[in-house]
Amino acid sequence: MKRITTLSFFMLFCWITAFAIPRAEYPRPQFERNAWINLNGEWTYSFDFGGSGLEREWFKSTGFDQKITVPFCPESKLSGVEYKDFINHMWYHRTISIPQDWANKQVLLNFGAVYYKSEIYIDGVFAARHFGGTSSFQVDITPYVKAGQTHNLVVYVESDVRSTHQPSGKQNLQFASYGCNYTRTTGIWQTVWMEAVHPEGLQSVQMIPDIDQQQLIIRPRFYKELGGKLEVTLKDNGKVVSKETVAANSLSTVILPVKKMKTWSPENPFLYDVELRVIDKAGNVVDEVKSYAGMRKVHIEGKKIYLNNQPYYQRLVLDQGFYPDGIWTAPSDEALKKDIQLSMEAGFNGARLHQKVFEERFYYWADKLGYLTWGEASSWGMDCNDIETARNFITEWTEIVERDRNHPSILIWTPTNEEFWPDRVQYPRLMQDLYKLTKAIDPTRPFHGTSGGSHIATDIWTVHNYEQDPAKLKELLYNDGKLMEAPKWEIQLMPKNIGFNGLKYTDQYTFPQYKHDMPYLIDEFGGIKWNPSQQMESAQNTSWGYGEPPHSLEEFYARLEGLVNTVLSLSDHVWGYCYTQLTDVEQEQNGIYYYDRSPKFDMKRIHAIFSKNPETK
């Protein structure tokens, strides 16, 4: 019997290895349950270029003719499709089998992200619709499935990156990649999974670290409230630090004292384990969730950003999260971790995550490794003066902040990038609404309305400047005691902006100017183009970057060190930086590493440049 059991396990291991699920790791490590099924792997699909699939009732499909590997987008090599042209309509299908022991539980279908609009059908019946290409969403499919049975799951996707109604980030609005715009991502691009949850189970929790009072505050939300209890335990490497029990309702607040508190920081990224158990009236444990928390505080005093009540200088790198074979999707969990390690090896203490909402497992590794991040949406491509666009974006941004607010590695919320809209009503209204909304969801972090753009509502002031001469950069950033401000442009407005948008055709619009009342950072600079290939001259002419490229490697190092030292020398006025960028991305070849993550430079020299902090004065 023992021999048979051993043989069975060996055969099972071989079978699993042969049919390995891509991205098989648990996708939500800060809210983890045991009863789950990963739906990544082989699906069938069909493009719907005529947009007639609904009319032809493709939602009733039991399988399409072509195969795709989920969670990789059809534009990517890893999907097995690699279709590069625009995809406005697309259909997916796979079967889902509901385990028998999931009876009497809610069956929840989770999508890490689907770009852009998606509709979910079970056995031909409409179950849900979602707007937003970078935010996660959950569908309760309990009414449509039965335990012990197999069902048809169909996902319909719509996307039009050229519509101006949906944020698209750095996706091309032309057929081919150009400048700082790259291959598009359509459809499913993050993990899809099912989980079984008791009807009284936890829907979410908000964790608020309070290092001043040495306590962790937890606010739960439940699917249903039927009079049970919530038990929360805080542990330090298996040892109980604090334990509290409250009523299992969404008005409860759990306050966990944290004696001998260990704070989270890049120097010591300590994480406490958090265990949450829902107990019904009969004393049965009906839901268990594993989580973690970092005790850290970020706030602003005057012109400086503080971490754990100490001024903290951020040496960030721009990370766009693109991969040669997966586009927006990392090929593996190890690749996510490796990107952070590469950045730290280069001397950075964090990253501005640029024009893409990174998946939860990236933040998990940032939390574990002690890596600072700024959370940003993929805002490019949308018309900020358009009311429908604003409606779409506000919904998506809400879901982004609610999902990621518990990660200690996130210091700043930045919904948009380089938005310059000469408008006195709609753009200011959008920025002010985003500010109020973000503060209501998460009052613990600074809000940064638009990176390097027109600052309407913000807690920090940022500029972008790609001047390649260090002396000129210093003059531009700080000349005769005056910091670089937003441009003063005279705008010739189109007649359609008359009246409702508050501007007349001949009005001059002046962008908001810095008032020296908040931290000031240069959160894009550098971007030095360098491609030391065998075809040097040809590569330098066809690749893309900022300014005239250096003529030699030594000239590159000298320019880089000069630019960084210039910014550091202004630390009394410029409190942090973000260098462009971590890796090359397609034709944009100004990364510290190549697109495949191999080193481009002598990393000891690079680390020596980027690991420097300003001199204490």
Residue ranges with predicted function:
Residues 16-80, 156, 160-165, 170, ...:
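Accessory carbohydrate-binding/adhesion or oligomerization-edge regions at the termini
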Residues 25-30, 45-50, 83, 87-200, ...:
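Accessory beta-strand-rich segments of carbohydrate-active enzymes
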Residues 29-55, 114, 184-187, 199-200, ...:
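Substrate-binding clefts and catalytic carboxylate motifs of secreted carbohydrate-active enzymes
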Residues 71-131, 195, 199-206, 261, ...:
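Active-site-adjacent substrate/metal-binding segments within catalytic domains
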Residues 1-22:
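Bacterial Sec-dependent N-terminal signal peptides
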Residues 427, 451-479, 530, 534, ...:
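Substrate-binding cleft/loops of secretory-pathway carbohydrate-active enzymes
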Residues 146-150, 221-299:
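Extended acidic/polar, glycine-enriched regions
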Residues 435, 439-455, 575-580:
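Aromatic-lined carbohydrate-recognition surfaces of secreted/lumenal glycan-active proteins
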